[in-house]
């Protein structure tokens, strides 16, 4: 159970990034799944694009284990608030 929108988005991005479901493209897929989730939930395309750009370096750090899920949640909340 994820109590709020940001928690759901965080889990979606983190789970896809860390699952290694694909040989290549897990980070890109996690970002684009997040963008799609934003769009499905009524966010404007411009805001979703901002999310995608902002998440590029963050996704790399998540994959490299430099950022955990809790820190990712904080960063996502910040990105959504800007």
Feature locations, PLM:
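FIC/Doc superfamily catalytic core
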Residues: 1-82
């Amino acid at each position: 159970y994820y109590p709020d929108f940001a928690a759901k988005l965080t889990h979606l991005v983190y789970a896809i990034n860390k699952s290694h479901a694909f040989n290549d493209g897990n980070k890109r897929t996690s970002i684009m799944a997040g963008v799609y989730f934003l769009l499905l939930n009524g966010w404007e395309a411009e805001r979703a694009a901002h999310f995608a750009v902002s998440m590029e370096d963050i996704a790399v750090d998540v994959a490299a284990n430099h950022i955990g899920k809790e820190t990712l949640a904080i960063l996502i909340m910040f990105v959504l608030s800007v």
